[in-house]
């Protein structure tokens, strides 16, 4: 892949990086065990860094369509490829499809916390002939209804 600039330069001085703290409350016991806490999706940004969650639940999908539980070992950092890295690499690096499933019954009374750091390129970074980081983000936020 021919990136417009090195990845480390793309995120340098970015004003759109975002750290989220997500709280998944404990279950009451009447939830459907097959329901999802977060449906399968890919992140819009370049790369997501994620400290292992406090409880199991995060799963990633492999290229054959199989789901795999992600570790919650302390000190582990998960690296997810986002749609912007897929775009800038011309599809060479596919976005990580992931979801959060309900916990098993023996741990369902515990809250789950997650802290993803979404790394975004600077607005003017050229992702492809069609997009800068800014135009790509705006288009995607419109698609999912987070921007009008």
Model-derived segments and spans:
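C-terminal flanking tails of non-heme Fe-dependent oxygenases
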Residues: 1-148
